[in-house]
């Protein structure tokens, strides 16, 4: 399903929707 284009703050990958991962800047991205 990929990574939804939603700016979502995170501390770990499991907080991110779809296949997004939590990046160093603290937001979910592809």
Curated annotation (Swiss-Prot):
Q: Which InterPro entries match?
A: Prot_inh_squash, Proteinase_amylase_inhib_sf
> Keywords in UniProt for this one?
Disulfide bond, Knottin, Protease inhibitor, Secreted, Serine protease inhibitor
User: What transmembrane ranges does the database entry give?
Assistant: none
Query: Which pairs are disulfide-linked?
Result: 3-20, 10-22, 16-28
| Cellular localisation | Secreted
Is Oxidoreductase included in the keywords of this UniProt record? no
Instruction: Note the site residues: Reactive bond.
Output: 5-6
In terms of Pfam families, this protein maps to: Squash
What cellular component GO annotations does this protein have? extracellular region
A GO MF annotation of the entry reads: serine-type endopeptidase inhibitor activity
Gene3D superfamilies linked: 4.10.75.20
Family as reported in the entry's similarity comment: Belongs to the protease inhibitor I7 (squash-type serine protease inhibitor) family.
What's its job? Answer: Inhibits trypsin; probably participates in a plant defense mechanism.
Domain notes for this protein:
The presence of a 'disulfide through disulfide knot' structurally defines this protein as a knottin.
Q: This chain belongs to which protein, by name?
A: Trypsin inhibitor 4
Q: Source species, please?
A: Momordica charantia
């Amino acid at each position: 399903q990929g990574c939804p284009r939603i700016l979502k703050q995170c501390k770990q990958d499991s907080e991110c929707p779809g296949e997004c991962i939590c990046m160093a800047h603290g937001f979910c991205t592809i």
